[in-house]
Amino acid sequence: MTQPSCPCGSGDPLDDCCGRYHQGHPAPTAEALMRSRYSAYALGLVDYLRDTTLPAQQAGLDLDGIRAWSHGSTWLGLEVENHEVLGGQPEHARVTFVARWHDADGEHAHRECSGFVQRNGRWYFLDPTVALKLGRNDPCPCGAGGKLKKCCGPWIT
């Protein structure tokens, strides 16, 4: 039996692509995590979307809204425009992409440059829509030990 293709657009079977990350294997790059998150939206894997967001931001996610958007949309495709590893301790990266979907209001395209941070061997999405009540000189919520302004601050403040 033929496995379904991965929604991320790689052309690979789901189990050989994003499916392995959905099952708990860490994504090796920020781009792989971003692709797996797009696939999670297409497949309705809201817990995965929560778990791959920076832990300090997870409580602020609107999981019901994410679930409604995920299930109420037909996911049409993903185009990765750029993946840039920024380095640093912890390592940061950004991925620029266009996601396309169709819902009750028609077809949509969303272009975004997303930030990611790697902690303890796992990449996390830095969600700019989830506010953190932190000052620029407070410790960064990624747990690296540095100040927010020098670490993840440019992505989440």
UniProtKB/Swiss-Prot annotation:
Can you tell which superkingdom this protein's organism belongs to? Bacteria
Q: SUPFAM superfamilies of this UniProt entry?
A: NTF2-like, Sec-C motif
Enumerate the Pfam families for this protein.
Answer: SEC-C, YchJ_M-like
Transmembrane feature ranges? none
The coiled-coil regions, if any, are none
Q: What protein family does this chain belong to? A: Belongs to the UPF0225 family.
The record's listing under HAMAP family reads:
UPF0225
Q: What name does this protein carry?
A: UPF0225 protein PA1039
Organism the protein comes from: Pseudomonas aeruginosa (strain ATCC 15692 / DSM 22644 / CIP 104116 / JCM 14847 / LMG 12228 / 1C / PRS 101 / PAO1)
Taxonomic lineage per UniProt? Bacteria, Pseudomonadati, Pseudomonadota, Gammaproteobacteria, Pseudomonadales
